[in-house]
């Protein structure tokens, strides 16, 4: 079930299809790749965990280790991206890894991490939908989605720039955005489990660093 969930939710190493599936108009991309289709994998895994009895810890280890690998991979892959929609594809890959991370932590007994992961499914859907619609607005207005050509967005198009800023702060989990509360639960649950497990503590720290780096990177385009 976990392997199938990785494929449906574009987790490493089964991520290849998502960045190449961005040719649709942005409202379609917002619905399929932001709000619905890619969420099926994490929903199936969450349902499986909720309905199962005792789950072997190896399932949790595989889930959280692959989640951290996917976070870092997604972050490194969207750094060189120039096309905003491809950037959002890799961002989605990384954000869904947060959900898998929280679900994996629940195997070790963290109900808080599980709740945060499920909440993040919905929060990310709204946030990423806004980002895709911003990409569509820019493409319609400027005739391009290439990031170097839209740098300094806040000065040129303040309304769209504000929308971009809201989406960027939400993706990063800056309070009072809804994603702050879901990420906070995942991270808090991770540190609670990590108090008795050094490896998990380190993995949670990596997640925090990746979250901060993501926000810093998005700020450069505003």
Where are these regions (language model features)?
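Hydrophobic transmembrane alpha-helices and their helix-loop junctions in integral membrane proteins
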Residues: 1-221
